[in-house]
Amino acid sequence: MAPKRKLSDSDAPEVVHPSRQVQVYGDEPKPAKKRKSEPAFNKKQAHASSVNTIKKKIRDTTRKLERAQDLPADVRVENERALAAYQQELASAEAEKIRQKMIKKYHMVRFFERQKATRQLKKLRKRLLETQSTEEVEQLKEEMHILEVDLNYTQYHPLSETYISLYPPKGSKEDAEDKADKEKPPMWKEVEKCMEEGTLDRLRNRKPDITISTTKPVKLPERKSIKHKPVPKPKLEEQAPSIDTTGMNRRQRRAQRGVKDSRATKIAKNKSTGFSKNQAFGAVEGARADEAQDGNVSDGGFFEE
């Protein structure tokens, strides 16, 4: 059996088709592919669906700080730092939510205007190659610069901000000259400046200047100093001077000491309206009975004279 040929001994250039010579590297190592490295500011932020979760965390942390007044110092500081981090995270999520909304809203307008600017730019380049007069060349270069800025405007306009259209709608009666001389939006100048500085990507992904309101400002409760009420001292009862009660009965002794008679108080309490009427009626009937006994009235006996 014949031995295998080495790759260096084979006629590789003759066997391989000329159109595929680039794919045959021979002894040289295969060149590594360059990976596209995205800048740090172009990273995708928190998804818009996490806004409610972050708001719930902010509410829980706020209630914990407001209601628990006797928290230790280290726990309180940790919760305050967590609350600040949640608020910053909520602002980023709200900004991403606005960004996605703006992208969806102005996607078709940007696409059509980009296609229109590309077509017009191709026409001007073709005319530039065909023309020979220097004046026309200068004029075409100026128009090409305007269209290049228009094209970059459609591509690198900030995604989080309102997009202002460059071209009028189809129903307008403006001529081509009026369209060229039309006043550009304020962002157009910024795009032209960023083209010179090479910061178009940063302009495209910049955040809006509008401050996003996250939640109501949290007012942390002030610690109230506990004031201990002074304990009242027991009052010393003044001892009444001793009274000589020899030779007095019980009622007299109680009157001398200033003790109220419980029996008299009970009688006074029971003197209601009905009780007083009955008492008056009994007094009248008693007086009549006394008069009957004193007078010469027959009692129905057998020994009357």
From Swiss-Prot:
One biological process term in Gene Ontology: maturation of SSU-rRNA from tricistronic rRNA transcript (SSU-rRNA, 5.8S rRNA, LSU-rRNA)
Subcellular location: Nucleus, Nucleolus
GO CC annotations, alphabetized: nucleolus
Residues forming coiled coils: 49-155
Alphabetized UniProt keyword annotations: Coiled coil, Nucleus, rRNA processing
Pfam families named among the record's database cross-references: Efg1
Function according to Swiss-Prot or TrEMBL: Involved in rRNA processing.
Protein name: rRNA-processing protein efg1
Organism: Sclerotinia sclerotiorum (strain ATCC 18683 / 1980 / Ss-1)
Phylogenetic placement of the source organism: Eukaryota, Fungi, Dikarya, Ascomycota, Pezizomycotina
Name of the encoding gene: efg1
